[in-house]
Amino acid sequence: MGNNELLEVCNENGVGLGRPATRETVHKEGLWHRAVIVALVNKNNEILIQKRSKEKEKFPGLWDLSIAGHVPFGHDSLSCAASETMEEIGYMLPKEIQLKEFRFMTSFRSQLPISDTFLENQFYDFFVFNSDIPIESFHVQDGEVEEVRYVTAFEIKTMAEKGLFHPRTEWINVLYNYITKF
């Protein structure tokens, strides 16, 4: 979605105020808003990650979870998680599993000052989606993603420690604990 996408402004506790603002406005003014992150986990407990294009304005060339996005005004996080799965990796989920297979893990608050004119103040809802989608089934967007791969939770922790991962990493320990239980 573009900078005109409408998002719901939240207070500093993550409560929606019922007031829409454009994506450009919330980032320019540092207004709080909601977003989702989804970890796609296969039967081997490997997580799908993507390498952001070097052309990206924010965090070029860094690895990140493959599914993330803003929650549009008037939508909920769960339906957003399902639609972002299609948008981000080009995989249409069968209707019967679209929502029931997403496991809510936690919410967290994240502040990332990107530049003088771009403040990312977001409340993330973090979901896990268990599915054995083969890597060749994904259709990534040119100019957005350089590569996708499945890795272990330990590999993600190591990559983050080396500075190879997107700096928004509050979800890593939650995912690591979830996966290592099995």
Predicted regions and their residues:
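Acidic, metal-coordinating catalytic segment for phosphate/diphosphate chemistry
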Residues: 2-37, 41-43
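A residue-level structural signature of the nucleotidyltransferase/glycosyltransferase Rossmann-like core
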Residues: 7, 30, 46-47, 137, ...
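Short gly/pro-enriched beta-turn/loop segments at secondary-structure junctions
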Residues: 33, 97-99, 122
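A glycine-rich, hydrophobic loop/mini-helix early in the fold
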Residues: 35-69
